[in-house]
Amino acid sequence: MYIVKPSWLCHSDDQKKFEVYSVTVSPDNQRVATGGQDGKVRIWSAQSIRDSAKGDNESSDTPSNLSGAPAPGAKQLCSMATHNGAVTVVRFSPDGRYLATGSDDRVVLVWERDSTKVPRKEFGSSGEADTESWIVRKRLAAHDNDIQDLAWAPDSSILVTVGLDSGVIVWSGTTFEKIQRLDAHNSHVKGITFDPANKFFATASDDRTVQIFRYNRASATDVTFSTEATITSPFKQSPLSTYFRRCSWSPDGNHIAAANATNGPVSVVAIINRGTWDSDISLIGHEAPCEVAAFCPRIFARTKEAAEKKDKKSSSEKDKESDVIDVDAEPKVPESVPITVIASAGQDKTLTIWNTSNPRPVVVCHDMALKTITDLAWSQDGMSLFATSLDGSISYVQFEEGELGYVVSMEENESRLTRYGGGKEAAQIPESVEQLVLEEKVEAKEVKDSEKRMEELMGAAGAGSKAIASGATVIPSPASTVAAAAAAPVTTTARATTPLTAATSNPSTPAKPAKQKVTITKDGRKRVAPQLLTTTSSSVQGTLPAATTSSAAVPVASATAETIPVNDFSKPSYALPKGGVSTLVIGSKRRSDDLEDGSNGIQTALKKTRPDDDVPEYIAPVVVSPATTTSQVRLGAPKVRNLLMRSMTVRDAEKPRMANESVSLANGENTSSSSAPHSFNFEVRNGSGNDQTPTKVSVTRNSQVVFVDFVPYYVHLIAGNGCYFWATSAEDGSIVVYSPNGRRMLPPLVTGAPLSFLESQNEYLLAISSVGMLYLWNVVDKKAVFPPVSLAPILDSGSRYEDGGVLRGPHVTQCGVTGSGRVIITLSTGCGYTYDEGLRSWCRLSEPWWATGSQYWSATQLLGDESAKSRWVLAVEERTAEEAQRRAGGRGRYLKQLTRATLNREGYEGMEGVVSIAHLENRIAAAEMLESKHELRTFIIMYARRIAEEGLRSRVDELCRELLGPGKSQDSTWSPTVCGLDKHELLKEVVLKIGKYRESQRVAVVYGQAIGLLEDEVLGVASSSKSAASKGSKDKEDNEEEDGDHDMTDFKDAMSEQ
């Protein structure tokens, strides 16, 4: 072993040396790249450095050849000064094509050698001319502070960068697009290393933790990440004075060497075990904090014979061998046990080299540099080591054969990585012909779907251009509004009047920008009130919830005279106040800490005062009813207004149940068979509420009066449409229902208390009284969908307590009914509810927990234009997002970080993935309950894909079994359809979606055969395979087919037994 410091191997300018922060060696061992304080990336000839060590280096100006090898005799091959700050990290990609460099200018540059470009000497430099040309292929700018370290995946598929902004950013290794930012650390991130098995990567931070991230790739651009573990124990007392915390993963994948750890007061290198992620071994050999630890990329053997001997042991026997020797054990290791070597260095200016065959360091080089050693890089053959220092020096360490051991072949590395799913044998091979056929079907379907989406996009663009060019008239479908003449003390906002799913409107009409409220303080300063982003979005039916953040564009169908989308959700009967309708509940508990001991030892309740501003001013019950004073729930009700108006545009063709009720206009024309749209106005003018001045109720169609009625009481709520019925609500809670032509269909419905909500959709009429009772009727069938239900369970009245017995509950922010008769209510707590008739219970559709714990909360779903009328689940989640943002105020990001910190605590590993899967399962159940078939189909496909990615074969089997059904033994409880979707067709889509995940292919093939998805293709492929194979391969295929037949027979028998 010898150490060489060539005088020319440094970052210098005009006799001044600059600090050097990083070094890396190319995979072919021909180039060494360094980065320093001078802002330059320098590439050196590795051969020239080795020749300098031997003393026979000769200078040469011969340019680099085109084969990729540096010019013989050249020292500095290239100098690049593109960065605007000090270069803190340089790393070659494992395939040798790219060089990634990071700097304190917050930018990562990806370089590639250009053999066609003539190298030129840098202007103003006094050194030798470049012999190679490297150009910037990509500039990656996403960090907010200095970049400290970066690393490539073993297959160069992804690039991960870390920096002082506490961020971990993942980039594509092919397109260099940003894939994801992981905010798992709470302080500077100063080191990163990849698992050679290509399953994990680890990051080290000044928050005294090492985070282990698992990543799964379904394709080159489809990568999912989750936190596998958080290691804290070895770093609890680690100092924060180091420049870096560069860690390294062992070549066999068993261990991580983490720098800047402590064992009591002593600075050590912690060895972290894979799988358990604990640290029971510490390398003690430094007197000051360690900056960098680096495993040699090769595995060694103790003797030359052991290195040359071919390993014939089974993988199970290899697993039993231990790679790390206990410190207290004898330094005698069997020759068959492979050895790994690790180098470490830091602020004590000492280089220490260890191997797993000896409990003590193999080499300790004191005062190797004058200042801190910042980086270490091994050559790919494992026989040399490079070190950089803040004194400007770059050291080269050359080992002789046998000093560290004897290098074994790379097959040994790959064989040991196989147990973790790495190496050449990591790819799971298909087990049968059926799996190959399934993969072909999946690929063909993906290509077909891609072409179909492209055709739809091109077709939509063409149709839009044609419509504009021809000057076609676009007829909007206006949402229900309250006339400006109906002056009332109710303050309306854009958010409050937005329906649960946005109303269909003309997409060509630009949305007006929301005006921000500007106030001037006493000192003359202007203050602009923050505007909630979701309130500025256009309320166009068919757009996805504003809570989504994906950049994917969602096509919106234009509402022309030929096709007018119909809103399938009840429009609000009146403009809700800001924050929703207030509620008061009577609690059933008393707070224990509100009791104090009296003089006689008896506990008495503390009296509390209620501020006057807690009582809502804009909404109050219109009458005092005995039911209200004794009810457990009290809701605010709208005040009586002079004018109520409801406008809408419908067509007669949209009357599936009432088409026979034609409307005759004044000229005698019958319009029942017309398909043209008609404009309806439902108007109520309140009188004095007595017989002398009654209230006038009227409906007009295309400005022609349909009917007029008079009632001797105040009307404060209206609902209905021109297809099924009209409805009015009196101040005493009675409801009068009219047919589209004005006939009283029912006697007045008496609820016993004033109404707070009156909504309608299709044939359904929804009413909620001020005492919290919910009613739902099918007006056409003249039946109640279910008995009256109280809102008390969802207002959480049972867990509330107050001395006075009455306290403020959550506000009702939205209430409505779908076209299929499903009630949806959202509260100011962010939760959305529906009442299920079969379960006789309220069910929670959405809650703020999913927003903080699920990876799918902000995922945009392209459900297609045909589903614009039934995006109930996503619409409820939009309400949840709005309420969560409103309640968090400006602390949303802070609360998110707190949640992330919780997910990273010990015992909560993998929690985010579990919550994400649970969120998808909740979405599926909610979509099925709301009969939203388009959402149900999308969520099932998403769920199948996720559980297949996670390798949850039991859940994949459970999902497929439910869609397949009981087989021959017909089960009366099983239905072949769900929400109008054929379960077997859904199963085909699920099988094709999970078919590319080989961990789940065995399950997918069985169910694909059960529904006849693979029968014809399997016969064709099997016969062609038999004719082309040899006799031995034929016997093997016959055995595989026989086993497959037995599996299919067993599967069918199991189905018939059930």
Swiss-Prot record:
It is found in: Nucleus. Keywords: Chromatin regulator, Nucleus, Repeat, Repressor, Transcription, Transcription regulation, WD repeat. Residues 49-73, 307-327, 500-536, 591-610, 651-696, 1023-1058 are annotated as: Disordered. CDD domains: WD40. GO terms for cellular component: chromatin; HIR complex; nucleus. The keyword Ubl conjugation does not apply. SUPFAM superfamilies: WD40 repeat-like. WD repeats lie at residues 15-54, 82-121, 142-181, 184-223, 239-282, 319-364, 368-409. Residues 661-678, 687-696 have a biased composition (Polar residues). One of its GO terms (biological process) is chromatin remodeling. Its main location: nucleus. Residues 1046-1058 have a biased composition (Basic and acidic residues). It holds the Pfam family HIRA_B. It comes from the Eukaryota. Required for replication-independent chromatin assembly and for the periodic repression of histone gene transcription during the cell cycle. Belongs to the WD repeat HIR1 family. PANTHER family: MEMBER OF THE HIR1 FAMILY OF WD-REPEAT PROTEINS, PROTEIN HIRA. This is Protein HIR1. It comes from Yarrowia lipolytica (strain CLIB 122 / E 150) (Yeast).
